[in-house]
Amino acid sequence: MTSYYEGIKVPWVPTREEFIEQALDLAQVGKGDILYDLGCGDGRIVIAAAKRGARGVCVELNPELLKKAMENAISEGVAHMIKFVRDDIFRANISDATVVYMYLLRSVNDLLKPKLKSELKKGTRIISLDFEISGWKEVKVLRVSSPARIGTYYLYVIGVSDI
């Protein structure tokens, strides 16, 4: 499945289940957080965050994927903690996020930089799987692996990484 954001084709490649908790640990996601997943796919990241007590916002342009995310949240008993937004990630309002999760392409990350910098509050954490945000300094880098895959998480903090 594919979504188009601002005319850019972004394939849906789900984050491996065994990597999710490591991402949430890296950003210290918990109660009181509002986690936005930009291009949320089947909702697995916001669902895991909701199970930790965080509220989630699932931003997805593809209606089939958004429906699947809603169904998954209902079956996991956390739908009441997640807002589902069918929108382009470049247009969605993300200003109340305390954490943003992205598994996009580097080119898309770079196009999102102005939005992230202008809309997010100082201290907001950004987790990106496998693709850096060019020109920003990561606060932490975490290598993750499973028998089937190796990945890298980059953690950025608004007001620290984007200077």
What are the functions of these language-model segments?
Residues 69-70:
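Conserved SAM-binding loop
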Residues 42-54:
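Conserved SAM-binding loop of SAM-dependent methyltransferases across substrates and taxa
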Residues 55-60:
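Conserved SAM-binding motif I beta-strand of class I
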Residues 1-33:
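S-adenosyl-L-methionine
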Residues 32-41:
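Conserved class I S-adenosyl-L-methionine
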Residues 107-163:
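C-terminal substrate-binding/active-site "lid" region of AdoMet-derived donor-dependent transferases
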Residues 95-111:
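A short SAM/SAH-binding and catalytic strip from SAM-dependent methyltransferases
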Residues 77-89:
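Conserved SAM-binding strand-loop segment of SAM-dependent methyltransferases
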